[in-house]
Amino acid sequence: MAKRIFDTSYLIGHWRIFPKATKRTTDNMRAWSEKLIDQYGTRQIVTPVYIEMVAGVTSSDELKLTRAYLDPFEIIDEGKIPKRDWDEAKVMSQRVAPKGGKRQLGDCLVRAIAKRFNCEVLTSDKGFPAR
């Protein structure tokens, strides 16, 4: 079985279903992400996923919660994205799906990095580029 990494769409979807009756604290958000990790048996993400999550916050409080949520994850590329990943993302960006639709820079780069690490990408994004 291939290793698996989470895409931003999976993390955002999980973030949004945090129980409404529970207060969002750094400890609770960290524990919440650990539940996702336990459920899927992986804690791996890539740098673009981390950046997309952090870039989506709208306040300093939300930033603290997001960082706590992301703490348990392992960034497998360690922030090192070589030229070959960019080249692969470029190739993916030029693939037009039969039904059309736009490709996103982040999605293409996530897929390229995942390919380098021989990982399956867990995503809920229907337009995510195929291998």
Regions found by a protein language model. Give the residues of each.
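A general structural signal for well-ordered alpha-helical segments in protein cores
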Residues: 30, 50, 63, 86-89
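Conserved glycosyltransferase catalytic-site signature
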Residues: 8, 47, 104-108
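Short secondary-structure capping/turn micro-motifs that flank functional sites
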Residues: 105, 129-131
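Short beta-strand/turn micro-motifs composed of small residues
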Residues: 47, 123-125
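A generic structural signal for short hydrophobic patches within well-formed alpha-helices
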Residues: 11, 50-53, 128-129
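Short, well-structured N-terminal submotif of metal-dependent ribonuclease cores
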Residues: 1-45, 55-68
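Active-site neighborhoods of divalent-metal-dependent phosphate/nucleic-acid chemistry enzymes
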Residues: 76-122
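Short loop->beta-strand "edge-of-pocket" segments that line small-molecule binding or catalytic clefts
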Residues: 4, 42-44, 72-77, 120
